[in-house]
Amino acid sequence: MSGFSPELIDYLEGKISFEEFERRREERKTREKKSLQEKGKLSAEENPDDSEVPSSSGINSTKSQDKDVNEGETSDGVRKSVHKVFASMLGENEDDEEEEEEEEEEEEEEETPEQPTAGDVFVLEMVLNRETKKMMKEKRPRSKLPRALRGLMGEANIRFARGEREEAILMCMEIIRQAPLAYEPFSTLAMIYEDQGDMEKSLQFELIAAHLNPSDTEEWVRLAEMSLEQDNIKQAIFCYTKALKYEPTNVRYLWERSSLYEQMGDHKMAMDGYRRILNLLSPSDGERFMQLARDMAKSYYEANDVTSAINIIDEAFSKHQGLVSMEDVNIAAELYISNKQYDKALEIITDFSGIVLEKKTSEEGTSEENKAPENVTCTIPDGVPIDITVKLMVCLVHLNILEPLNPLLTTLVEQNPEDMGDLYLDVAEAFLDVGEYNSALPLLSALVCSERYNLAVVWLRHAECLKALGYMERAAESYGKVVDLAPLHLDARISLSTLQQQLGQPEKALEALEPMYDPDTLAQDANAAQQELKLLLHRSTLLFSQGKMYGYVDTLLTMLAMLLKVAMNRAQVCLISSSKSGERHLYLIKVSRDKISDSNDQESANCDAKAIFAVLTSVLTKDDWWNLLLKAIYSLCDLSRFQEAELLVDSSLEYYSFYDDRQKRKELEYFGLSAAILDKNFRKAYNYIRIMVMENVNKPQLWNIFNQVTMHSQDVRHHRFCLRLMLKNPENHALCVLNGHNAFVSGSFKHALGQYVQAFRTHPDEPLYSFCIGLTFIHMASQKYVLRRHALIVQGFSFLNRYLSLRGPCQESFYNLGRGLHQLGLIHLAIHYYQKALELPPLVVEGIELDQLDLRRDIAYNLSLIYQSSGNTGMAQTLLYTYCSI
């Protein structure tokens, strides 16, 4: 097999189809041809002398040799001039292209044509007799099998005839190896395998033989039939295509191939084939033309290609007007009506069905200012089908020609709606389209009262008609009937809900918008998810307008869970239904990793989620989904469901469309921080604020939030974080103060004092830093083992007095000074400042409640402790009853 081409080996081994084999072979031949051309160019460049014209002596010697050697005889001993005469008499060309090229070269070299002699004529008569016998037989293609291998080919056929199949196969393989372009060995191999019963292998070799001898159309057709026996429609189409290459006008081949294309579902190719058949049919084949055009128009119409269907039917009507039947008129009118070309449909009906429309003008008022009114009359001959009459009515309605409709309507309503319900509906829909609701209502009422046409689509039209006429209650009943018959009809549900809301029935309005699909269906069916999303949008709007916030949040979470399904799995968040609040509602909870579906289920869920995501984003844009998410977060916080707001933010941050948008990601992080603080989840809040202050070191608002979070977290991990950040940003004022606070809380008073002094130097007029320095000195003086305690106390109170002067006399400043004295045991001085603070009102700060800044309870409690320790319990109780009782 080493001499075989790789594509042939792959085809024989069944690795590729025959179409692939032919494609690879053509590509290989093209590559080989290009490589030969490139080699020829290279050799011409390397040996430029070879491309020059040879000397005349060489030419003359060649000519003399050609004349001497039998005067240009062919291999069978006959001069080429005889062949020329023979060919000119028969009007045929040589089959062998190589011999034709040689003849052309001979003719170019010979200066004068050779005239036939008497001997040539004698030989010509012999050749004519021989060729006449050949022409009596079937014309066979010229073989590409070399003479040296013809004997071996004959031997292989003899071996096959004797039953020695293996030897015959080996001989054929050897011939293929030496002459891969000869079709005879492949044909013999096909017969051998067919004799063995291996029809698949036989077909393979037959296809190769046909490929090497492609002009035999009957062989291609036979191979197509064999392919169909093996249910290989694609290969059969390929064979018919090959046959049509050599017989492009064969109608049978075109018909068979188009039928196969229809079986394959390739509507376009099938219709192209049928169109070619139409072009090939003669004018005498009118019936066949009309039938084929009729079938093509129906097929185009079913494929929603109305324009092509109209073109086909127009061509049929123009070429064979005398063969147009009532069925053709009905089809043409249907096509034009579906394309809203009512004038064309009316023209077809009046031209080919015998129906006559006449305009009669009254004689009154002949002036141009007072144009005479026109009365249109309609005459319908007997035998016109009711279908065409109804299409005439539809056209008249849309063209606003209403005069002849009354007798036509009378004729229609005389028909039984059980039998002619579809015609009733066509006319009713035409009236609805032009706004003639009063005319449409009787027809629709007759249909909904029938048994056969008591359908959802009819009830829907009936409801729309009643709604347009203002009969809201009856319209609501009809919409309810639609929902009963078709529970998944979204538009009917929405219309029913809107009507019931207008009629003052909010509970029924909500009931109409109950979910249509279960969660499993929504997770797998993209169209179901799309319908459910539209319904939930209307339901959420209705719930919000009714003030039902828990139900409103349920719909928002349901919609967001459809979008964030994969993201929620990554965030380990699950949406559950629970009745913990007394009513059943949806809640977001955190679940463990082992409760999340395994990887295989996750992959399939991801694939489904991609398809569903494409549908969901077609209903709502990215910004609409973002607004929906914000509404859900705000609503959860309004209901004090802060933990669920956190989980929703976590899931949204796992959603790539939101996370990739930097602005939205930052906004989500702020939402997460706020929800965590409101939920008192300060550990999680610290994770948010830590990143924020790293990115915005010089933002005081973030440092204020950071201080609040760390103050409530009861955690000291932020100490090292602040120190590391201080090394990177040594000039940051907020970090300086925070590090002072951290050191003060940790008992490192000297470190705290250094940080406070640094802050004091940059902002000496800030009362806080004077207060912090004074308080630090007092704490240092309060330690058990300390040197120069008196100096520390003096320095501490000097800074506290500075704080008092900067802050001014107020409840806060006197209270803080009293606390310092109280800590040092200077009770009499502490009582003085406590009493002064107790006499002053609390500070008024915009945005903060007055009670939040009132220190009288704290002052009274400290005073009560002093009085109690001194034995004055009555005074202590009086203070507690006055300021600390609830």
UniProtKB/Swiss-Prot annotation:
The modification Phosphoserine is found at S43, S282. GO terms for cellular component: fibrillar center; nuclear membrane; nucleoplasm; transcription factor TFIIIC complex. TPR repeats lie at residues 149-182, 183-216, 217-250, 252-284, 290-323, 326-361, 421-454, 456-489, 491-523, 733-766, 811-844. The modification N-acetylserine is found at S2. Residues 1-121 are annotated as: Disordered. It is found in: Nucleus. Residues 92-113 have a biased composition (Acidic residues). Keywords: Acetylation, DNA-binding, Nucleus, Phosphoprotein, Repeat, TPR repeat, Transcription. GO terms for biological process: 5S class rRNA transcription by RNA polymerase III; transcription by RNA polymerase III; tRNA transcription by RNA polymerase III. Its main location: nucleus. Coiled coil: none annotated. Involved in RNA polymerase III-mediated transcription. Integral, tightly associated component of the DNA-binding TFIIIC2 subcomplex that directly binds tRNA and virus-associated RNA promoters. This is General transcription factor 3C polypeptide 3. It comes from Homo sapiens. The lineage of its organism: Eukaryota, Metazoa, Chordata, Craniata, Vertebrata.
